[in-house]
């Protein structure tokens, strides 16, 4: 409803279907493509690697080929999960990636493929690494949502591990503002950004 109210055209198709995506993009001729198609949760990725590969890398392959044909600025949504466990108290874009599990590993592999398209085809890109999104319309059952639901329902809040792990939460409106800045600023081309709250 929100998209319709703002006159944003919605086309529903499977991003794994190359011909359907090509036909759609030929109608739009995009200057910018924001690639969001993927399995969106680490637990799901670890439970079903086959589907994760298909939904993450097949969709990216199609998107890259289409972006290349229009020389579109590709904005690829990666994840802070590419860092794995890190020793530093703060993570920067220069922190060495050492992903754990299927989700982080596939996100990092996809980043390398995006960069390869830039090297071989001069495709402009920006990689965004958000962390722990929360906010309106979030239905992915991430840790923040689970904690709030349990608190409201009077249930226990369980913290995994020894309690020393840190997670930088990102409010959805802040992420949207960051995306807009990436689109509007040519200095964002061929760069990687951690889009998080920063604490």
Describe the function of each predicted region.
Residues 38, 48, 53-60, 64-67, ...:
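Short alpha-helix in the Rossmann-fold core of NAD(P)-dependent oxidoreductases
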Residues 42-59, 91-99:
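Short alpha-helical oligomerization interface
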Residues 108, 133-146, 155, 160, ...:
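Glycine/proline-rich active-site loop of Rossmann-fold NAD(P)-dependent oxidoreductases
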